[in-house]
Amino acid sequence: MLSLIYYVLATIICFVLYLLSWIAYFLTLPFDKRRVVVHFLSKLITDTVLGIFGRHVVGAENIDRKQAYVIVINHVSMMDIMSIYPLPLVFKWVSKREVYKIPMVGRLLYMHGDIVINRASTKEAMQLVHTRGMEWLKKGASVSIFPEGTRSKDGEIHNFKAGAFILAKDAEVPILPVVVEGTDNMTRGRFFMNWKNRITIKVLPPVSKQDVVERPIKEVMTDVRQQMVDALAELRANKKK
């Protein structure tokens, strides 16, 4: 019963905020170059959907609010996109084309200016991420990317693709590693909510612009992945205590 009430109330609130997002989008588009207002309304939507699970941010002190980053995040659930909105940054997502077909979600991503890619064409996708990513980074907005390229089926962090790291190097911006834990355990079965579940977002120290520019991409990519693997293991160990 509680799950049903949650779904109904969350749907109503999200729909109202969705309508407000359209209004804000048209009113602020001429002067809001980073689409901060729409981003804030999306944060309210994610607070409605995920706030009940007690999202906890660890390592927020590693973020410079005035800096644009390439954010790299592990990917285990569709909720990963919603999970990091507590971070004090305006960011644009790189997301597969199929997500844009989801009612409301696709339109919201469009209003954000998120980067939609066709994973069937790797070369085209990489070019689009690079071009649009550079545009947003120059405007001062961060770009969020799942470096594994797809959702992990076993919850572990697998090999990274180089796209996010090439973008950061060419744009000369720091890389901000973020590890999310708990988004894959929000429900019991297909419908009932797991009310005891908690979501933790751990922000790791960024890779400096100097390191991104001067060090080999493969080396940076390997180091960042290992840091994220270690951080995820630590979060899981702490959760069992």
Regions found by a protein language model. Name each.
Residues G51-V58, M126-Q127, T183-N185:
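Short gly/ser/thr-rich secondary-structure transition/capping motifs
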Residues G59, I71, W93-V94, I201-V203:
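Generic preference for hydrophobic
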Residues E61-R65, M193-N194:
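A short beta-turn/loop motif at secondary-structure boundaries
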Residues M1-L27, V36, E61-I63, K218-K241:
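Membrane-interfacial terminal anchoring regions of lipid-handling membrane enzymes
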Residues Q127-K241:
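Non-catalytic C-terminal accessory region of glycerolipid acyltransferases
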Residues Y18-H39, I52, R65-T122:
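Catalytic core of membrane glycerolipid acyltransferases/transacylases, capturing the structured
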Residues H56-V57, V116, V143, I175:
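Hydrophobic beta-strand scaffold residues
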